[in-house]
Amino acid sequence: FPEMNIGAGTVINGAQCLDALNAGAKFIVSPGLSTEVAEICKANGVPYYPGCVTPTEIMQALDLGITTVKFFPANVYGGLKALKALSAPFPQVKFIPTGGVNRDNLEEFLAFDKVAAVGGSFFVEEALNK
């Protein structure tokens, strides 16, 4: 699938980010926000989706020019209710919830206009069980 857009996840430092980019990653995802990773991604023109769950983390992401963030773990930090609350002061931010997203709540998350995408291990688990 040459047209597939493949990235790297759970990237937590600059060295891992550079390794992922050298391996061909087209985007980077982190469980938290790393200024070092953000700067490397910006310099290489690669999207970076850091984990942000508090207003402070979201403001730090915005200061770095990042407007789409990973919301992880979504189930621990309040799920869709929290996303809706955070969207009030940050209407320009889109979220990618992961952690606790499953077939039972997938449509509810995707129906919210501030959700850019979702992630979850259930995609892989279901494919492996076939």
Question: What is each stretch, according to the model?
Answer:
Residues F1-E3, N22-I28, A43-Y49, D63-T68, ...:
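Glycine-enriched alpha-helix->loop->beta-strand junction motifs that scaffold or abut catalytic
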Residues M4-I12, C17, G24-L33, P47-I58, ...:
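Catalytic beta/alpha-barrel core
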Residues A8-G9, P97-G100, V118-S121:
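Glycine-rich beta-strand-to-loop/alpha-helix junction loops that act as flexible
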Residues N13-A23, T56-L64, K81, S87-A88, ...:
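Catalytic cores of alpha/beta
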Residues P31-V37, K70-L80, K114-K130:
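Glycine-rich phosphate-binding active-site loops on the catalytic face of alpha/beta enzymes
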Residues V37-C41, E57, L83:
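Aromatic/hydrophobic pocket-lining residues that form π-stacking "cages" and hydrophobic walls in ligand
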Residues P73-S87, P91-G99:
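N-proximal accessory regions
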Residues T98, L106, L128-N129:
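Short capping/connector residues at structural and topological boundaries
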